[in-house]
UniProtKB/Swiss-Prot annotation:
Record-level Gene Ontology MF annotations: magnesium ion binding; sesquiterpene synthase activity
Entry binding sites for Mg(2+) 1: D295, D299
Top-level taxonomy: Eukaryota, Viridiplantae, Streptophyta, Embryophyta, Tracheophyta
Organism: Phyla dulcis
Obligatory cofactor(s): Mg(2+)
Protein name: Trans-alpha-bergamotene synthase
One GO biological process term: (-)-exo-alpha-bergamotene biosynthetic process
Residues that hold Mg(2+) 3 according to the record: D439, T443, E447
Keyword terms, alphabetized: Lyase, Magnesium, Metal-binding
Function: Sesquiterpene synthase converting farnesyl diphosphate to trans-alpha-bergamotene as the major product.
Chain positions of motif DDXXD motif: 295-299
Source organism, top-level taxon: Eukaryota
Length: 542
């Protein structure tokens, strides 16, 4: 009998008793009335703000405080007006009179909302040799740095802007006497604003904004109240999921796998943070839980013969043909089968569209690529970097997650758009590739020790003979290139489309989870702190 391997995974620190104990007073109607009043006041503030720079600062603050979804129409009208004026004014006015901060902020906000603004707006800040000129304006340089991350492939001016601003900010960081500016710079250098999770950014920015002498107290109060009210909804979502998880018996029956319900919920929350989309978060969390189990028996617990049969059963999708599977695989298959049918039933009932064949294909394809990687591992095969990535961007489960997100949030589902998405265009491929590469950077060392297929780092080292450090730099460059492709294909085409935003969020949650290592499989203090901040600890209103 073939000995089974173990991942030696740590137990979950989030038990059901603790999760069920979570409560919040912010479900009361009085808070909803208070929030509605504050939202009306903010709309007045937006309407009465007339100066262009004041408008840009206001929009930026609203976004970073995590309340912009309440003011989409108002923000869009302001930015449309700014963009139209920018197009008809002379070049000097377009450049905001050569003010680096204003030009950079305007560029970032307009691009973020899908407006096609040329990188040439930064030419007046460069010398004859094409280099950015040193300026004594750290606030402006920080704004330039943040703007540079909305670049697309081939935009060399923005590439120079990033190099210049990064170098300058690092050099000046220890000399800064303003503690707020220093903290902003330090955080930006860790991960730029464009690739941060909105909800976590809001927690941090609320604290920063509150310490400013010019803070607008109406914005601040709404941001705090909004965060606490949404947190109350997150608590209810997670409590429901914990009951579901316990009732399935999966934690006991699949005790070889990682028990990561709370972390799966954090993935779903990063994907879809909007309070009213709780059902979508529940679906994504369920899917993530099932993926983790399946991943762990393909990678570690299952024998090659077992996973070959399981892969075949996923292709057949027949619950009457499971006798050849061991018990743990029968349970996993039925959990996938029942969950898929439940999702398909809800959409058929609500929209009259049958997506069960779409879901079957997703799970069958995932099984195929998992099995390909398992054969690589068991045979000792080292794929080339290209061969690895052609399989691994799918095996990281990005397509499964993105399509379940699409089905969960799009109502009505556009069948032509769905057919287009099933060809795996950039809106599917690029976020999935970022997830794959970020995962490899964070987990490769531990997974190789446990016994897993070589990752992109090892494949590149084997292919080129380079060091691990050089391979990691290569993977980081691949991530950067892929993020630029995302900016072009997703942000510049569908910035206000809910699914476009969700696809961008997959890249963001990937960078977040693997920024300090394996923040999912081996949850570290940073993951725990973020979960506490988002789900457990409210923000003080006073």
């Amino acid at each position: 009998m073939e000995a089974r391997r173990s991942g030696n995974f740590k137990a979950s620190i989030w038990d059901d008793d603790f999760l069920q104990s979570l409560t919040s007073p912010y479900t009361a109607k009085e808070y909803l009335k208070q929030a509605d009043k504050l939202k009306w006041q903010v709309k007045v503030i937006i309407k009465e703000t007339k100066q262009r720079l004041d408008q840009l600062d206001l929009i930026d603050n609203i976004q970073r405080l995590g309340i912009s979804h309440h003011f989409r129409d108002e923000i869009q009208r302001v930015l449309q007006n700014i963009y139209e004026k920018m197009r008809v004014e002379c070049p000097d006015r377009m450049l905001m009179e050569k003010d680096l901060y204003s030009t950079s902020l305007q560029f970032r906000l307009l691009r973020q909302h899908g407006y096609h603004v040329s990188q040439d707006v930064f030419c007046s800040f460069m010398d004859g040799a094409g280099n950015f000129q040193a300026v004594d304006d750290l606030k402006g340089i920080l704004a330039l740095y943040e703007a540079s991350f909305l670049s697309r492939e081939g935009e060399n001016i923005l590439g120079s802007a990033r190099d210049f601003s990064t170098r300058h900010l690092k050099q000046k960081l220890e000399e800064i006497t303003d503690p707020i500016l220093a903290e902003k710079i330090r955080r930006a250098l860790e991960l730029p604003l464009h690739w941060r999770l909105q909800k976590l950014e809001a927690i941090w920015f609320i604290n920063i904004y509150e310490s400013r002498f010019d803070a607008n107290l109406i914005l601040l109060q709404l941001a705090k109240l909004e965060f606490n009210m949404v947190q109350a909804q997150y608590q209810e979502d997670l409590k429901w999921l914990s009951r579901w998880y316990k009732e399935t018996g999966l934690p006991e029956k699949m005790n070889f796998a990682r028990d990561r319900l709370a972390e799966c919920f954090l993935w779903a929350l990063g994907f879809i943070p909007e309070a009213h989309l709780g059902q979508a978060r529940k679906i994504l969390t369920k899917i993530a839980v099932l993926i983790v189990i399946m991943d762990d028996f393909y990678d570690i617990y299952g024998t090659l013969d077992e996973i070959k049969v399981f892969t075949e059963e996923l292709q057949r999708w027949d619950i009457n043909a499971l006798d050849n599977l061991p018990e743990y695989m029968r349970i996993c298959f039925l959990a996938i089968f029942n969950t898929a049918n439940e999702i398909a039933y809800d959409i058929l009932r609500d929209q009259g569209i049958n997506i069960i064949s779409n879901l079957r294909r997703l799970w069958a394809e995932l099984g195929r690529v998992y099995y390909t990687e398992a054969k690589w591992y068991h045979s000792g095969y080292f794929p080339s970097t290209e061969e690895y990535l052609n399989v691994a961007w799918i095996s990281i489960t990005g397509p499964v997650l993105l399509f379940h997100a699409y089905f969960s949030i799009m109502n009505p589902i556009d069948m032509k758009e769905l057919q287009y998405l099933e060809q795996y265009p950039g809106i599917i491929r690029w976020p999935s590739t970022v997830l794959r590469l970020a995962d490899d950077l964070g987990t490769a060392s531990d997974e190789i020790k446990r016994g897993d297929v070589p990752k992109s780092i090892q494949c590149y080292m084997h292919e080129t003979g380079c060091s691990e450090e050089e391979a990691r730099e290569y993977v980081k460059q691949l991530i950067d290139t892929t993020l630029k492709k995302m900016n072009k294909e997703i942000l510049m085409e569908k910035p206000t489309n809910d699914f476009g935003a969700t696809a961008m969020n997959l890249a963001r949650i990937s960078l977040f989870f693997y920024q300090y290592g394996d923040g999912f499989g081996v949850p570290h203090n940073q993951t725990k702190e973020n979960l506490v901040s988002l789900i457990v600890k409210p923000i003080c209103l006073t």
